[in-house]
Amino acid sequence: APTATPLVADDSTIRTAVALWFSNRAAADATYGPISRWETGEVTDMSNVFGDAWSFNDDIGAWDTSGVTSMNSMFYGASSFNQDVGGWAVDCVTDMEAMFWYASSFNQTLGWCVDDGVRLSAAFDFTLCASTSCGVKQVAGGCGGCGPPIVDAARRLAGASSALLALALL
């Protein structure tokens, strides 16, 4: 059987595709390809995408989240979810409130560093990793940059060049 071209999602189509995926997974796979391969780089709002999806536990770790600004309640009540999403780019996210609330199987160390202005209220409540905030730390000014990767890389390179120049002048 031919393989579907993976979905290239935006804020609207991701919700349509997820709804189909839950109501008729075979049809969703035939239409959009496997959920693990969906192209999500154009999505900015992932709020509640898997809200109350108590049986969801598929691998979406390769999703491109670099443009996402809201993950509010993304896995709210997704009590079976325990996949590694630590590789997600979350530099642009400003709202993670209740992101994993009652995702009671979730026990991953995410390793994310986010700006101290990111809304994290109840983000990890009732998860197995709540006591450690699932490895998420907040830092004033964030830890990266929000923008196209080339711009962020240029900023880091410029900062490194300045530091090397300062050392050379000592």
Residue map of PLM features:
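Negatively charged
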Residues: 2-151, 159, 164-170
